[in-house]
């Protein structure tokens, strides 16, 4: 139901505000981010959701970036090795944490007592490392894995899926097919390079045409600096008539953490966002509730 | 006498030698942020842990350089151009700098403790994740990368090189060749599976190293390996369960459920291994090393 009101906003040509970064915001609050902290520091995760709700976000996303069965499995030689030397719950932890991610977002939404409806987006991304399309599993494997993630999200009460930081058409199509099979609304966000193409080398025109029959409600650009996101928007716009969204990162990736810079304070970020001329705006790594608040007030 | 030749004499006399315990899992247990092997935010705690192992009686100190190589940074970007485009400005220089720093703090801890007889082992490890032999590079790819790491460790002043958790024979051979180019003595240690073989499934080879060991596996598996390869002269298993975090893809040394191996039990097991070199891998603490020593 809450998604219907977001969709109505989109159809009426209104701007929809997405939240900002969660992972880097956890770091900025002096908590380590090797783990999603969904069980160890639920208070911090809930507080970040609350801050984005207070800032005026219409859609908040779960703190579940790259959280998959595979994320645990790939630390081991094989499943037998994981059972032999791994912690006892590693086979099911991914699903437990996805559910916890939705629960924390829902708790924050309920506690905020807002009058306008806010949708919870279950965040899922590439199954392998987001910047490495060369590692992507086969389409059949990917679709099966996306489907089990989508099922957990739908079952836990997510209103839509935000498939983010996608770096190839093949992965986007696999995720879209999984979402359609479950019957949950979905948006897809791609990582653009400096020329506004995908990391796989494919064009956004090709991505848009391949996805059109699967009917995502919004296509977005994220997980790249503002200039690259802008280049991606320009590449996508002629080929996508439905709403477009954008949420770049600001600062620098300092593996495995983030380097915060003062290059894009909220006022400059707002100027950039105005120039995008897109309907959905938010923030990726490095953005804060202050960035989102200014977008919500001025756009 | 220099630290390594003195240690070599002790080994030749048939004495038992106690290695230190792990850096990573012990630092993480104390809440250190595992970025740049802990050096990004907690260099003082790295130094302090070396000192704790010396106080516990360790005869050898290993540098905090496990799984520290250029790939750790490069693997999380599309390519080098992408790393320069969105990455922190100094990522190219990170590995040489941290390796130098790691050797420096180990030497400083030794000097401060006045234990000048303790040799410092420069730790080298697989270029990809230690539990993923399927990702191991070819000999030709691995050789130059290991050569750079060996050279950096040697130039920073380690006394010998220790190849840890090697998971395929071909990468061990490449790393051994690279390490030998420095002229320093080299020890090679393999991670083993529950069949007592190298994690890749290969039998443990007999290599031209100054000592051969096994590590990075539970005590039972280590015992299985020792039974199959009588040329092994050292062992340092992990204890507990590897508990990787939900997001980070590279090695993250968190071990839980270690209670079933208290120090006394570990020391009793180590006696039964009947090897000259004993120490501890992930999950082990200074308490365990103290128990081994006594």
Name the predicted role of every residue range.
Chain A
Residues 1-299:
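Domain-level signal for soluble alpha/beta catalytic cores
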């Amino acid at each position: 139901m809450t998604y219907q009101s977001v969709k109505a906003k989109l159809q009426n040509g209104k701007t929809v505000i997405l939240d900002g970064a969660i992972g880097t915001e956890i770091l900025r609050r002096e908590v380590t981010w090797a783990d999603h902290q969904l069980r160890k520091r639920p208070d911090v995760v809930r507080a970040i959701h609350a801050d984005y709700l207070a800032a005026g976000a219409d859609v908040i996303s779960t703190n579940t970036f790259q959280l998959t069965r595979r994320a645990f499995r790939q630390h081991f030689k094989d499943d037998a090795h994981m059972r032999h030397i791994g912690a006892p719950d590693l086979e099911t932890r991914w699903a437990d944490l996805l559910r916890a991610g939705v629960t924390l977002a829902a708790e924050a939404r309920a506690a905020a007592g807002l009058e306008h409806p806010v949708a919870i987006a279950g965040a899922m991304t590439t199954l392998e490392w987001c910047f490495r399309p060369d590692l992507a599993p086969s389409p059949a494997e990917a679709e099966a894995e996306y489907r089990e993630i989508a099922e957990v999200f739908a079952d836990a009460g997510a209103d839509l899926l935000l498939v983010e930081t996608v770096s190839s058409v093949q992965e986007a199509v696999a995720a879209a097919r999984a979402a359609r099979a479950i019957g949950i609304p979905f948006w897809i966000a791609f990582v653009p390079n400096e020329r506004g193409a995908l990391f796989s080398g494919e064009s956004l025109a090709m991505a848009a045409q391949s996805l059109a029959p699967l009917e995502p409600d919004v296509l977005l650009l994220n997980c790249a600096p503002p200039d690259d996101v802008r280049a991606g928007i320009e590449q996508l716009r002629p080929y996508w008539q439905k709403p477009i969204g954008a949420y770049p990162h600001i600062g620098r990736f300092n593996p495995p953490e983030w380097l915060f810079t003062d290059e894009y304070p909220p006022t400059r970020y707002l100027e950039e966002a105005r120039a995008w001329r897109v309907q959905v705006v938010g923030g990726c790594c490095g953005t804060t509730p202050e960035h989102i608040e200014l977008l919500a007030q001025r756009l | 006498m220099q630290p390594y030749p003195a240690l070599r004499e002790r080994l030749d006399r048939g004495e038992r030698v106690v290695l230190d315990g792990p850096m990573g899992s012990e630092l993480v247990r104390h809440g250190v942020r595992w970025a740049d092997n802990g050096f990004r935010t907690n260099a003082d705690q790295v130094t302090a842990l070396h000192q704790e192992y010396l106080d516990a009686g360790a005869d050898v100190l290993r540098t905090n350089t496990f799984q520290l190589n250029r790939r750790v940074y490069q693997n999380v970007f599309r390519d080098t151009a992408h790393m320069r485009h969105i990455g922190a400005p100094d990522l190219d220089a990170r590995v040489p700098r941290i390796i130098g720093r790691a050797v420096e703090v180990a030497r400083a801890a030794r000097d401060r403790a006045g234990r000048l007889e303790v040799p410092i082992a420069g730790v080298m490890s697989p270029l990809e994740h230690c539990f993923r032999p399927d990702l191991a590079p070819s000999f030709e790819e691995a050789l130059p990368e290991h050569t750079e790491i060996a050279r950096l460790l040697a130039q920073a002043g380690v006394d010998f090189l220790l190849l840890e958790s090697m998971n395929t024979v071909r990468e061990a051979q490449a790393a051994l060749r690279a390490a030998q180019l420095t002229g320093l003595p080299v020890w090679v240690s393999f991670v083993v599976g529950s069949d007592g073989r190298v994690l890749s499934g290969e039998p443990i080879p007999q290599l031209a190293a100054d000592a051969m060991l096994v590590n990075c596996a539970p005590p039972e598996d280590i015992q299985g390996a020792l039974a199959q390869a009588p040329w092994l002269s050292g062992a340092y298993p992990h204890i507990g369960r590897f508990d990787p975090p939900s997001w980070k893809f590279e090695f993250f040394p968190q071990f839980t459920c270690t209670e079933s191996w208290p120090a006394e039990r570990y020391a009793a097991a180590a006696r039964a291994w009947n090897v000259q070199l004993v120490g501890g891998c992930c999950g082990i603490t200074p308490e365990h090393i103290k128990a081994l020593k006594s």
